[in-house]
């Protein structure tokens, strides 16, 4: 039986590059892996992501995989929900992918992440909309009060975006189902933001669409 973890307590990698053993004890909130270029930070992240992907759908005792193992909290959990953010704004070079997308605005890796997140954001809105309708029509007074709480994370996300972009006069368009911004009377798509603004949007939007569920966010910056 699958049991979801709240967070990863430890990552262990045996024989990294055939010579190093890595054991990384993790906090429940924020963990930073730092060091000079070439020390293996991205390699550790990539190995972790690869084996976390393999865990999905498999009842593996406490996350053990050949060469890589995870200790979860609680320790009898055998998988974890996770997302990966890579904040490099390099041009996309996969011509087949660009043709498949059919969106000329998607030109960089950050654009691609935003494109995928837009679709998840639409699904998120449908889900919370359905929950609000269910609560409002239940006939239970307490449920009607809870309905306002369902949309609170989305409102908080919008408020945060407005605050972060306040110096450039950008505000998120709260009437649109898609992520759009207003600036001096113009409508901007996320693809028109600066690289730094795209990075902030990707991080906050990734967290929002988790819908308050426990998950691990891995970032390569």
Language-model regions, residue ranges each:
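Hydrophobic anchor at the beta1->P-loop junction of P-loop NTPases
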Residues: 33
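Phosphate-coordinating catalytic segments in nucleotide- and nucleic-acid-processing enzymes
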Residues: 1-5, 9-14, 25, 46-192
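Conserved Walker B
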Residues: 161, 219-221
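GG-anchored amphipathic helix commonly corresponding to the ABC/SMC/Rad50 NBD signature/C-loop
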Residues: 51, 193-218
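Phosphate-binding P-loop
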Residues: 22-28, 182, 208-210
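Walker A/P-loop
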Residues: 42
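ATP-binding Walker
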Residues: 38-39
